[in-house]
Amino acid sequence: MSGVNEIRSSFIDYFVKNGHEAVASSPLVPRNDPTLMFTNAGMVQFKNVFTGVEKRPYSRAVTAQKCVRAGGKHNDLDNVGYTARHHTFFEMLGNFSFGDYFKDRAIELAWNLITKEWDLPKDRLLATVYYDDDVAYDLWKKVAGLPDSRIIRIPTSDNFWAMGDTGPCGPCSEIFFDHGDHIPGGPPGSPDEDGDRFIEIWNLVFMQYEQLPGERLNLPRPSIDTGMGLERISALLQGTHDNYETDLMRAIIAEVQELTNVPSNGPQKASHRVIADHLRSSVFLVADGVLPSNEGRGYVLRRIMRRAMRHAQLLGAREPLMHRLVPVLVREMGRAYPEIVRAEALATETLLLEETRFRRTLERGLSLLEEESAGLVSGARFPGEVAFKLYDTYGFPLDLTEDALRGRGIEVEREAFDAAMERQKAEARANWSGSGEAATDTVWFGVREREGATEFLGYDTETAEGAVRALVQEGKEVSELPAGARGFVVLNQTPFYGESGGQVGDSGLVSGEGVKACVLNTQKKLGDVFVHDVEVTEGTLKIGTPLALEVDHARRSAVRANHSATHLLHEALRRVLGDHVAQKGSLVAPDRLRFDFSHPKPLTADELAQVEDIANTYVLRNEPVETRLMAVDDAVASGARALFGEKYGDEVRVVSMGTDSGNGAPFSVELCGGTHVKRTGDIGIVTVLADSGVAAGVRRLEALTATAARRHLNAASTALQTTAGTLKVSTAEVEARVAALVEERRKLERDLAEARKKLAMGGGGESGPAVIEVNGTRYLRIAISGADPKDLKAIVDEGKTKIGSGVVAVANTAADGKGALVVGVTADLAGKFDAQKLVRIGVEVLGGKGGGGRPDMAQGGGPDGAKADAALAAIESALGA
């Protein structure tokens, strides 16, 4: 049978020929659903269609949906690599009917595909139905000709699907394939159904009810939702019982074997499979805008990456491996998912950086793991407290600890680990549960369905006329907004830009006969409904009211300059740093711009200067900024940059600016729906303020343009001139003069520290005799005041040199009355006295607690510096005890 790519295509083509719309996979980060960590099923992008709050221009659809299950309820991570069918990343093939065909056509389409198109033997197929679904039972007999013995009624929830406690629901019918009696396992519904003989290949969900509190009603327009795992059906069609034996997975595993020189069918087979699976989820998540971090989706990605990297080390990889596998994945899957082609450089850089960091973590963590587990035998339990220490101190995830111990037959004490982790787990849940795109209020679905999209005029004009189509206040439609009221207005057309793509929404004024309102902000709902946040200042705003619309021109002009500048900076960053640079977010406001991009380390001063110079070169050329509409595939194919994870329509706006000196092509070409200047010279000037880190592998550039940049530069110039006047030098000499002053200050501080040290050594400071003997041990006690805390250790070291053998204690009283204490023990007495124990005795007298350091040098402090002498005396008593 054909390869995985051909099987995917044949599924989609079959349903297209049968009247279905081919819909692209949605991103792995769900849209409009803050409760879901990752897209984990084909129906996720159609959730609002099934519930009736969203309408699509088609009633039948077919998709190949990329999915991840590695966190929360749907978590396959721990099993991946050790079974034939578990994955973190998988593709879900599905056909959908939104109130169109129902059970009879769904069963007919499914049966014809698998038996006629794919030629699966009919006598190896069986179906399950919900126990009271007589209609589906009879259809399987009629359409497929299945005998009663191969139609199984299932009474459990396995064959009844519900979206939640309320909403659409209905019975399921699953198609199973019988691999033969040479494989253990029984049919579905039997005691040994979990065996590998009977494998589910397709699930058909018949959404025919609506669950309400206390009752279940028939839906007026029943729907169909189906799901078939591409990996599972590909294995079957390619004659194997193992998903990892398909051509796609074999290609990745073969590359792992080539790079590690470890056979993929030997004792370390599981490691090859973990790496192959986790490579897919890692690259696809990065392509959809997720980067490794310590919270939310980024933390799940980091766990996936690091689990794969741990197995790379088990295969003997001495250098980072994962990034070297990206090309084979792009070669195998890039045609079906062009986003991973665009993200190849970023994914490669991210994997290399993460594996480099993790190898340092592994070295520290594995050392402790081996030390703590050295005496354990098979069947023993590894202390949960130590597992938590590995996690908390060394960044060593629990699943890696369990993975490392599994081969030796050792389990982790999960109870103790879970108790220690309770707080962190609660925080992690809070971090991601609301981290998705905010859910859209239901009211806007109704407005969108009734009024359609808002016509946006703002690319060509900042003034227009429009009519009120809807008014919304506190989540509900209203008929009017009186003077003093605040609410949302939807117009038939508008010049006001709605907040999107990082660009802030427009503000301005709307007015009509007897009515005026300030537009405070403009947003976009459902992609194309422009919503104006207004405060009525005169009269009453009503449905149908004709209005004159005027954008705040000065504010829009400043926003345009900043948005165009982000495009120039984006391309300049790529020219200076490399092709791995990709936009990760932005803020385009009237007073500033902020641009987040992928890069593993801070920019040097020279790199920042180069980026700024390149951007200003194109500003000074004052070249035209061109925009045109193109088909999205043509735009991307032409080289226009797209934002990873962004959802584009069939037609997109392409913004080009500048001319590359080398080849005459446009300097910057991006897909962008924002507003821009007419010529690059309208930006005025670009001034980069700062580069900072916002997450692992993500940097942030902040900059100003036009008037804001000029004011900033003027302020900086004024400050420089004022400083020059204070120093009595020219502005050109300020840097050298300040450097000289800083060095002079450092020298004075060093001289002062040396003077204090000599004073302390000279006569024991304020405490009288410097050295005494306590039970044969020399004890040097020094009480001083006003010393820099960082000088105390130097004084102790000097004291240890002076006495040769013994104990030195220095107590300092600061200007605020607090006390600091440092205790040192010479090397020859290391086995007799512990500086940490001695310092704790003195710190307690100062009113403090604890103290830290090493057995030969420790420090601590307390609020009562007046008791410095008493603290030194307490240490003396301890030496004599």
Curated annotation (Swiss-Prot):
It comes from Azorhizobium caulinodans (strain ATCC 43989 / DSM 5975 / JCM 20966 / LMG 6465 / NBRC 14845 / NCIMB 13405 / ORS 571). This is Alanine--tRNA ligase. It catalyses: tRNA(Ala) + L-alanine + ATP = L-alanyl-tRNA(Ala) + AMP + diphosphate. One of its GO terms (biological process) is negative regulation of DNA-templated transcription. Its cofactor is Zn(2+). It is an enzyme of class 6 (ligase). PANTHER family: ALANINE--TRNA LIGASE, CYTOPLASMIC, ALANYL-TRNA SYNTHETASE. It is found in: Cytoplasm.
